[in-house]
A protein has these predicted regions:
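Short acidic/polar active-site loop segments enriched in Thr and Asp
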Residues: 123, 148
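Conserved active-site tyrosine of GNAT-family acetyltransferases
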Residues: 142, 147
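Extreme N-terminal starter segment of soluble prokaryotic enzymes
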Residues: 1-2
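Conserved beta-strand-loop-alpha-helix junction that forms the acyl-donor binding cleft
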Residues: 101, 126-138, 156-160
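Conserved G/P- and acidic residue-centered "switch" motifs that form tight phosphate/ATP-binding loops
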Residues: 104
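Residues forming the Rossmann-fold NAD(P)(H) cofactor-binding site
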Residues: 107
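Conserved residues at the C-terminal ends of beta-strands
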Residues: 81, 128, 153
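Acetyl-CoA-dependent GNAT
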Residues: 5-92, 97, 110-111, 116, ...
Length: 161
């Protein structure tokens, strides 16, 4: 496997990988959060929201994106962001083709991203994910890579009632 800088030629493949990678996540998350919250975040469905958000990432910050290839096929990608005011880098997006999950692709993308962040002079790296059951595999990967969970509580109240 090799990891290369993003090219717009990879855009559609990365969007496809992301939707397939997160296909099992969102139904489980939907079951774990209040309906009014899910509907507020995903009024046109999770796929539409994710596509919109990911297109923006790929179009607005291509220099922050790295792509994992197996042969000539893209199998995953990662986007990093640097927050110098906090001396911190962030793994903002990570997605691995379901056919290549649990083969070390995510781990290698995490290590690649962490090295880029360290090379930028940052003192720490952060990754954020959901606490719902759909995101349990992501949390397991992050913990296996030495990330420590920061307890955060996020509350929502339905004002339509």
């Amino acid at each position: 496997m090799r990891i290369v800088s993003y090219s717009p030629a990879y855009r559609e493949a990365l969007l496809d990988i992301s939707l397939r990678a997160w296909e099992p996540v969102f139904p489980r998350m939907h079951d774990d959060v209040p309906e009014f919250v899910y509907d507020a975040f995903y009024p046109q469905g999770w796929q539409q929201r994710q596509l919109s958000d990911l297109k923006e990432v790929l179009d607005q910050e291509p220099e922050n994106v790295s792509v994992a290839f197996e042969g000539e096929r893209p199998v995953g990608w990662v986007c990093t962001r640097i927050h110098p005011e906090d001396q911190m880098g962030e793994i903002y997006v990570i997605a691995v083709d379901p056919k290549y999950q649990r083969r070390g692709v995510g781990q290698q993308l995490m290590e690649h991203a962490s090295a880029q962040i360290k090379d930028a002079g940052m003192r720490m790296v952060m990754v954020e994910t959901g606490g719902d059951s759909g995101h349990a595999p992501a949390r397991a990967l992050y913990e296996s890579e030495g990330f420590v969970r920061w307890p955060v509580a996020r509350y929502f109240k339905d004002l339509s009632k």
